Amino acid sequence: MNAMVLDDVIKSQAGYLNPYILEERQLNVTQLDVFSRLMMDRIIFLGTQIDDYTANTLQAQLLYLDSVDPGKDISIYINSPGGSVYAGLGIYDTMQFISSDVATICTGMAASMASVLLVAGAKGKRSALPHSRVMIHQPMGGAQGQASDIEITAREIQKLKKELYTIIADHSGTSFDKVWADSDRDYWMTAQEAKEYGMIDEVLIKK
């Protein structure tokens, strides 16, 4: 059995506390940050806003885990306010592309683009802790400059809106029209309400 203890030093990078652990193996002791250690158990954390860096990291982790053990489940724990739609769609497409089922678990908040990733988990393997919140809404964006440039941006936002609502409707089983209407403004759901909406399959309660 591996013995693991919390390291005395917690490394701080860009204001984010990244704890390290010491993993004691038969022949040596290896220092790992806790997220890397969890990834060895096929657990990935999405605990920040979704941007290009986050998306690149998550996509790389998904592709790596799928390559070392194709078909074995991967879990993504989500506590995120959302972020870039383009970056999030990159994560979404990777989740659908790999052969491994991706289980999604909301551990606090899955809002905006993060809610799309939550509902995109493998059917029957999407869950949330009891006091989690899920929020869907229409994509936001701004434009300035010439009228033609503003029109181009507006058309793109409408395309993204339809694309995101289609994804939510397909994975949740809720009608496209209802998703469209509900997302006109911020639409917040408790864990139980998210289950009834089809965003998750189970509310996790300790037995």
UniProtKB/Swiss-Prot annotation:
Family affiliation: Belongs to the peptidase S14 family.
Active-site residues per Swiss-Prot or TrEMBL entry: 112 (nucleophile), 137
Primary gene name: clpP
Family matches, as NCBIfam families: PRK00277.1, PRK12553.1, PRK14514.1
Catalytic activity as recorded in UniProt: Hydrolysis of proteins to small peptides in the presence of ATP and magnesium. alpha-casein is the usual test substrate. In the absence of ATP, only oligopeptides shorter than five residues are hydrolyzed (such as succinyl-Leu-Tyr-|-NHMec, and Leu-Tyr-Leu-|-Tyr-Trp, in which cleavage of the -Tyr-|-Leu- and -Tyr-|-Trp bonds also occurs)
Quaternary state and interactors: Fourteen ClpP subunits assemble into 2 heptameric rings which stack back to back to give a disk-like structure with a central cavity, resembling the structure of eukaryotic proteasomes.
Protein's UniProt keywords contain Cell inner membrane: no
Protein's UniProt name: ATP-dependent Clp protease proteolytic subunit
UniProt keywords, alphabetically: Cytoplasm, Hydrolase, Protease, Serine protease
Highest classification ranks of the organism: Bacteria, Pseudomonadati, Bacteroidota, Bacteroidia, Bacteroidales
Gene Ontology annotations for the cellular component aspect, listed alphabetically: cytoplasm; endopeptidase Clp complex
Function: Cleaves peptides in various proteins in a process that requires ATP hydrolysis. Has a chymotrypsin-like activity. Plays a major role in the degradation of misfolded proteins.
Top EC group: hydrolase
EC number(s) on file: 3.4.21.92
Taxonomy, superkingdom: Bacteria
